[in-house]
Amino acid sequence: MDENALSYAAFYAVTVSLVGCLLFQSNWNIWLCANFLGYCFAAGVMLAYRSDIYCSLGCYIALMSTFHYMEFLTTALTNPANLSVDSYLLNHSVPYGLAALASWVEYAIEFWVNSDIKGLRWFGASGIGVIVCLVGDLIRKTAMFHAGKSFNHIVQGTKAKEHQLITNGLYSYVRHPSYLGWFLFSIGTQMVLCNPLCLFAYIVVTWRFFAERIYVEEYILLQFFGDQYSKYQKSVPRTGVPFVKGFKNNL
């Protein structure tokens, strides 16, 4: 792609974003996030397709932008009442941002030391990582569709009228398929980037995060559904995240 083409593409991107902000003033932040993720996806695909040396980075960018955009779109389709700009999960938390930053720093340093180790190899760790990301994201989005209005990005302390216990579909195999999907996706991203240090760190940190979250969430679900959820725990003993047991009511 020559410089003129890049200039036209940049001009088009800025123009579309500005026009969108004017037309959708009340939802300008949602529009900008959608544009940002769309441009990131396009840039990622271009890198993956046109550059052997940056192929893994391009795949990573495309996968990340797809993950966050589909979080918003899936919420819009299944639970529009809870839809907001936060549904993109771009501003998930400070630790989430720092984890992403750490992976970019490791990639940059290792690429500078030896760029050959960062090339995408479809039968190597990076290629397997792409598959892990796709499978993980598919599991998560499928779980969101199965849960419908009962799914929320934030653990709810109060039971809503439409809140139901979902036990069919993926929930008949594991109790928290959405967390399983996200766990796999997060690990897969570091395999794509060939980041050995962050791969280990992501496994430890995300496992601990989901272990704590599942424990709290299941405590609340037992308050919401009582014996119904206790029986569900017994019929579906796996949480989805390896070695995470969740909260058990021993009374």
Describe every region a protein language model picked out.
Residues 1-161, 188-251:
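Membrane-anchoring alpha-helices and their flanking helix-loop junctions
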